[in-house]
Amino acid sequence: MALIARNAKLLTGTAPFLQRAATIHTTLPSLSQQPASSPATSGGAQPPSMNTPAGISKPAEYVISKVDDLMNWARRGSIWPMTFGLACCAVEMMHAGAARYDFDRFGIIFRPSPRQSDVMIVAGTLTNKMAPALRKVYDQMPEPRWVISMGSCANGGGYYHYSYAVVRGCDRIVPVDIYVPGCPPTAEALLYGILQLQKKINRRKDLLMWWTQ
């Protein structure tokens, strides 16, 4: 009898722990136990897709993307480069702007003012004395703006790489988008570089990035 009383007392002391353990779920609930407000059983709105930016719906994303495409079409079809000739590469740049290659058919019109340009073509050797002027002209260009480095001297110093007076690449002064190799590069190479810049402009998503910030 003493043994039975001891076991009954032990079970009485462990009853709260058994009740607490019974409330712990060790398996996933079945579909039949889901509440009526669950998206899986109700006709409410589904959760947003993982590919959609936060805070924007699919129709809004589509409209914003189309506006971005329209802006990119206008920008790549009306590139106005500013002539920044520094050495012999500038002669090839002038050759590219003449009637033989006819850059006007691509909407490319050379402008003498940085405030009317969106692309700067750095053609030639950039010296330490000219570097502040290059940066000042770049800062005067409106956004969005791009830079094309034309020739070996503008890309990395070229023939004068070890000179004390030459900047070893104009990308140390301004950010460069397109590099055109050659010493000097031909007019076809410059045209190819501008076509690559048009592809880069076409991939921009300015409005979508601004909207999702």
Curated annotation (Swiss-Prot):
Residues 30-52 are annotated as: Disordered. InterPro entries: NADH_UbQ_OxRdtase-like_20kDa (IPR006137), NADH_UQ_OxRdtase_20Kd_su (IPR006138). PROSITE patterns: COMPLEX1_20K (PS01150). [4Fe-4S] cluster binds at C88, C89, C153, C183. It comes from the Eukaryota. Its cofactor is [4Fe-4S] cluster. Binds 1 [4Fe-4S] cluster. One of its GO terms (cellular component) is mitochondrion. This is NADH dehydrogenase [ubiquinone] iron-sulfur protein 7, mitochondrial. Core subunit of the mitochondrial membrane respiratory chain NADH dehydrogenase (Complex I) that is believed to belong to the minimal assembly required for catalysis. Complex I functions in the transfer of electrons from NADH to the respiratory chain. The immediate electron acceptor for the enzyme is believed to be ubiquinone. GO terms for molecular function: 4 iron, 4 sulfur cluster binding; metal ion binding; NADH dehydrogenase (ubiquinone) activity; quinone binding. Complex I is composed of about 45 different subunits. This is a component of the iron-sulfur (IP) fragment of the enzyme. PANTHER family: NADH DEHYDROGENASE, NADH DEHYDROGENASE [UBIQUINONE] IRON-SULFUR PROTEIN 7, MITOCHONDRIAL. Residues 30-42 have a biased composition (Low complexity). It is an enzyme of class 7 (translocase). Belongs to the complex I 20 kDa subunit family. It catalyses: a ubiquinone + NADH + 5 H(+)(in) = a ubiquinol + NAD(+) + 4 H(+)(out). Residues 1-31 form a transit peptide. GO terms for biological process: aerobic respiration; electron transport coupled proton transport; mitochondrial respiratory chain complex I assembly. It is found in: Mitochondrion. Keywords: 4Fe-4S, Electron transport, Iron, Iron-sulfur, Metal-binding, Mitochondrion, NAD, Oxidoreductase, Respiratory chain, Transit peptide, Translocase, Transport, Ubiquinone. Its EC number is 7.1.1.2.
